[in-house]
């Protein structure tokens, strides 16, 4: 399981950020922290609440934020447009990201075998995980204040 202090596992997927293009995490690491916000399913209630909170209540100025789900890129493109999400979404239908971060959720009762567990990771410019949050129960959202703090700390370390 990926935890604080670990090197962030690299993975490839598809980025939905206006267009659909290849995504590799290592290519996105650099000067500012990267936040990976894993969520189970586009268009579901709690996931939409979380993505809207990240849009409206989370200060993205000091980081690069990506929402990550196992949804297909074209579904994520429609979702991103409908909810006016100003950050990229990463489509992980091959489960490379959720396996690398060990955030796999069984959703068989919904007719889908595997989705992303709701989780958030902050990765500093050196590629080290500095913050990890995992949902303990269905419908739980991250502590956005704690996430803001974690990003600020990672950004301050990069500036030092």
Residues covered by each model-derived region:
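Chalcogenol-based redox active-site neighborhoods
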Residues: 1-160
């Amino acid at each position: 399981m990926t935890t604080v202090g670990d090197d962030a596992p690299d993975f490839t997927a598809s980025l939905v950020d206006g267009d659909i293009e290849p995504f590799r995490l290592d290519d996105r690491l650099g000067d500012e922290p990267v936040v990976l916000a894993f969520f189970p399913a586009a268009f579901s209630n709690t996931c939409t609440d979380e993505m809207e909170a990240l849009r409206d209540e989370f200060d993205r100025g000091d980081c690069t934020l990506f929402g990550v789900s196992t949804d297909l890129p074209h579904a994520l493109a429609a979702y991103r447009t409908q909810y006016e999400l100003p950050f990229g979404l990463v489509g992980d239908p091959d489960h490379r990201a959720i396996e690398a971060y060990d955030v796999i959720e069984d959703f068989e009762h919904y007719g889908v075998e595997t989705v992303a567990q709701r989780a958030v990771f902050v990765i500093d410019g050196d590629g080290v995980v500095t913050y990890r949050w995992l949902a303990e129960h269905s419908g739980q959202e991250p502590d956005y204040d704690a996430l803001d703090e974690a990003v600020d700390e990672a950004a301050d370390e990069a500036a030092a």
